Amino acid sequence: SGAMISQTSGHGDFRMIYEHGHTGCGCEMAHVEEIGASRIVDGPDAVTAATRENLRQGASQIKLMTGGGAASLYDPLDVTEFFEEEIRAAVRAAEDWGTYVMVHVYNPRGIARAIKAGVRSIEHGHLIDEPTMKLLADSGAWLSMQAFTVEDNTYPSPVQQAKHLQICNGTDRAYELAKKYNVKLAWGTDLLFNPAHTKNQNHGIVKLQKWFSNFEILKMVTSDNARLLAMSGARNPYPGKLGVVEEGALADLLLVEGNPLQNVDLLGDPGNNFSVIIKNGVVYKNKLQDGPASGNR
């Protein structure tokens, strides 16, 4: 999706309190813009330009920030970000390229505004209420959640920690409402800042057992996720189908010691339980034969 697109003071505005300029105000780039993490813009025209620039640089879909978040210090979770016409500007520009817009947002007001503007995927959504979940279901948009729990809290500041706890308090209710209204669910990790956390990402799958059957979990993290990504149409960077095992599909395959349909916990320890790992047709791990595996096709 390229750089996240944020309003001034939004979740993607990671300027320090002493930084006053960014490209959206006609100033020099803020550091967060220089490194390609964010585009800080205000107004439909600026949002359109930022969206088109991301697409020019190869984005397969577009991500806007339409509500507060935990990682940022200066935007509370309850705030709503970008006016509807600004969000709609991004949606129109993305649709002209045959793809879609997703938004980072937790609170119901921001979710509802994004849906009304044509957004196709809500990233997070943990603080959603029942009327907004029904609106989401009726729209046919996706909810891409993470099974955030209290033990995931690795934030350094008390402000961030308090916001994370507020988000976790909504996880149960959000999943329950999503099941009640049969919302299209995707799964993600939201792992960032510390590469060491990636070794624990599969624990996010294991935690889903609290709300879903093993079959529902496996379907969500494979074929359902693939359906969401496929909405990028011709912008889709993958050469074959995702999330299926069939001729002509992208060869991303795992061979697991045991049956995840009976025991999803197996996925929480890939080092011991994944016998074969194939990504895009390349064998990266093969415990079933002697010798090096990497690079074999």
Language model: regions and residue ranges:
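Histidine/acidic-residue-rich catalytic or RNA/ligand-binding cores of hydrolases
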Residues: 11-13, 72-74, 111-117, 138, ...
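Divalent-metal coordination cores built from histidine and acidic residues
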Residues: 1-75, 82-93, 132-134, 139-158
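N-terminal active-site wall of soluble small-molecule enzyme domains
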Residues: 83-94, 102-115
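Hydrophobic faces of well-ordered beta-strands that scaffold small-molecule active sites
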Residues: 1, 62-64, 101-103, 122-123, ...
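His/Asp/Glu-enriched, well-ordered alpha-helical/loop segment
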Residues: 96, 169-260
